[in-house]
Amino acid sequence: MKIGVYGASGRIGKLLLEELKGGYKGLELSSVFVRQKCETDFSAFSHAPLVTNDLKAFVRACECVIDFSLPKGLDHLLEALLECPKILVSGTTGLEKETLEKMQQLALKAPLLHAHNMSIGIMMLNQLAFLASLKLKDADIEIVETHHNLKKDAPSGTALSLYETCAKARGYDEKNALTTHREGLRSKESIGIAAVRGGDVAGKHTIGFYLEGEYIELSHTATNRSIFAKGALEAALWLKDKTAKKYEINEMFG
């Protein structure tokens, strides 16, 4: 399958190029979208990809787009994909309502998977969080997420996804149960998220379930960002023969 990398100059984009250089499970890098000069040496690739700032040409040259860009960038990409539908795997977070609506429109034309986190470990953390939220009915739930000092969105998309999982298990009103700036006493049907930014932390998420006299903490730490690139490539392979629909990462991992 021919892969197009959108957001190739970013942290995960560079890791995607590195994985594809070795021909990851038969995937071929066919196009790379860049706004400025790309520093990657493509001579090591078995097939020279199209490196372009022409979005339409970039989309036409591939069968699947893997996106790790910025919200505005993804919005522009979706406009191009609506004209020329291709499989989409996106890990871009912090999206506006309009962008999410365009994603739903694309899902009528092509298979896509949008996830705040592409790692198997986070998928498992979500499942454990749902179970703990359901069983520990009297526990107060708090989420702490830590990332590098260059991350732009806070709370992280992964933390918000974990919040949604816990709120759904409890039957809370998802729009009103979230607390990100706590003042005064804690309300019972609330879930807090604290965001920490510093250094070069790839990502750490901890969910605490606090009871009287004891507490449980479930935690996931990313020690290497390559897990996100490999997860996205696995998603591309998984989507290859799927029908048009917006898929969830939990479906991919069974």
Swiss-Prot record:
CDD domains: DHDPR_N (cd02274). GO terms for biological process: diaminopimelate biosynthetic process; lysine biosynthetic process via diaminopimelate. It is found in: Cytoplasm. InterPro entries: DapB_C (IPR022663), DapB_N (IPR000846), DapB_N_CS (IPR022664), DHDPR_bac (IPR023940), NAD(P)-bd_dom_sf (IPR036291). NAD(+) binds at G7, A8, S9, G10, R11, I12, G91, T92, T93, A115, H116, N117, M118. GO terms for molecular function: 4-hydroxy-tetrahydrodipicolinate reductase; NAD binding; NADP binding; oxidoreductase activity, acting on CH or CH2 groups, NAD or NADP as acceptor. It catalyses: (S)-2,3,4,5-tetrahydrodipicolinate + NAD(+) + H2O = (2S,4S)-4-hydroxy-2,3,4,5-tetrahydrodipicolinate + NADH + H(+); (S)-2,3,4,5-tetrahydrodipicolinate + NADP(+) + H2O = (2S,4S)-4-hydroxy-2,3,4,5-tetrahydrodipicolinate + NADPH + H(+). It comes from the Bacteria. Disulfide bonds: none annotated. Keywords: Amino-acid biosynthesis, Cytoplasm, Diaminopimelate biosynthesis, Lysine biosynthesis, NAD, NADP, Oxidoreductase. It is an enzyme of class 1 (oxidoreductase). Pathway: Amino-acid biosynthesis; L-lysine biosynthesis via DAP pathway; (S)-tetrahydrodipicolinate from L-aspartate: step 4/4. Its EC number is 1.17.1.8. This is 4-hydroxy-tetrahydrodipicolinate reductase.
